[in-house]
Regions:
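Phosphate-ester processing/binding pockets and catalytic centers
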Residues: 1-177
Length: 177
């Protein structure tokens, strides 16, 4: 079944991780509405690390009830996170291609987006249209489904209580060492 993936990252040295919120196309509209309903008055986006602990709990619990699947890819990193990110990203893209995903939306890191694009070109080969995977980098203020990945990445990286809160939506954890 074709799916869409919405991807964000979290770095908690010595661990780097990428979370992908996997969404069925028929649920995109409903999930966007659900995510926007979580905004506070005047808020343009959810950025989990900026939220207060009580609100974090409420947000994590709300996301755990959504009809979404989250996949997490982790790798240890000592200093530079980019090699770890690209290893996680490549594994994610490979899994998305195997699932015949149609859309990949990545939280933009502006100038650093070029590294993701290189990895995508390498994996998609000389005929990217054969995969039917369309990808784009967007700012998280313009795509509310990226917030699911942001919350999941933060909670997974924080461990213990936080990881338990999002466990209902967690489907896959790939540790790349």
């Amino acid at each position: 079944m074709p799916v869409h993936a919405f991807v964000d990252e979290s770095a908690r040295p010595p661990q780097y991780l990428i979370a992908a919120a996997i969404v069925e196309p028929s649920r995109v509209r409903l999930l966007r509405q659900s995510m926007r309903a979580l905004l506070m008055p005047g808020q343009r986006e959810l950025h989990f690390k900026k939220e207060k602990p009580l609100r974090r709990r409420a947000l994590a619990d709300a996301i755990a009830r959504l009809p979404v699947e989250v996949c997490v890819y982790t790798r240890s990193c000592r200093q530079l996170g980019e090699p770890a990110r690209q290893a996680c990203f490549a594994e994610l893209v490979g899994d998305l291609l195997a699932r015949q995903a149609h859309r990949l939306v990545i939280d933009s890191r502006n100038e650093q987006d070029i590294y993701d694009e290189r990895t995508l070109r390498r994996l998609l080969g000389s005929q990217p249209s054969a995969s039917q995977l369309v990808y784009e980098h967007v700012d998280s203020t313009s795509e509310s489904l990226l917030w699911i990945a942001d919350v999941a990445a933060w909670c997974f990286g924080a461990g213990r209580e936080w990881r338990k809160r999002i466990d209902p939506v967690m489907s896959t954890v790939i540790d790349l060492g």
